[in-house]
Amino acid sequence: MLDAFTKVVSQADTRGAYISDAEIDALKTMVAAGSKRMDVVNRITGNASTIVANAARALFEEQPQLIAPGGNAYTNRRMAACLRDMEIILRYVTYAVFAGDASVLDDRCLNGLRETYQALGVPGASVSTGVQKMKEAAIAIANDPSGVTRGDCSSLMSELGSYFDRAAAAVG
């Protein structure tokens, strides 16, 4: 796992070069948006249960076969596993937002997840849809302007969305 600062230093070291002006400017922008980044993480963390529950509810309304007898989320144990996995993905998305880097999401959550789901017979397309539903809910909550640092958050919302897209692609 690398945060944005460590990643820049590592890349410069690999090149055998000083940190470039462009890299410094990018890090300055990230620091300037630090309060917004923390607001996003706090909003998502504070509403994690709601985000997961609403995404699961919407998924099961669209794909009722998942919760029907014989479905992959049928029985309380399977449903609990589904919700747990969605919550884990959401948690790692917040880590990526906080760090400003997707490596924690990739390294500790997504690598090998598709293969695990395939081995267990979990429908990756359904998990991917659930992740997209979490994305919609999380962005709506994170983008609510009341009680947070003012300013343009479009870049941060795009970054947040990209982490969900990355997760959806990894499992789909």
Swiss-Prot record:
Binding site for (2R,3E)-phycocyanobilin 2: 153
Source organism superkingdom: Bacteria
Keyword annotations of the record: Antenna complex, Bile pigment, Chromophore, Electron transport, Membrane, Methylation, Photosynthesis, Phycobilisome, Thylakoid, Transport
Post-translational events: Contains two covalently linked bilin chromophores.
Annotated positions binding (2R,3E)-phycocyanobilin 1: 82
Membrane topology, record value: Peripheral membrane protein
N4-methylasparagine PTM sites in chain numbering: 72
CDD domains: PC_PEC_beta
InterPro entries: Globin-like_sf, Phycobilisome_asu/bsu, Phycobilisome_asu/bsu_sf, Phycocyanin_b
Similarity annotation: Belongs to the phycobiliprotein family.
Function comment: Light-harvesting photosynthetic bile pigment-protein from the phycobiliprotein complex (phycobilisome, PBS). Phycocyanin is the major phycobiliprotein in the PBS rod.
PANTHER family (alphabetical): C-PHYCOCYANIN BETA SUBUNIT, PHYCOBILISOME 32.1 KDA LINKER POLYPEPTIDE, PHYCOCYANIN-ASSOCIATED, ROD 2-RELATED
Annotated protein name in UniProt: C-phycocyanin-2 beta subunit
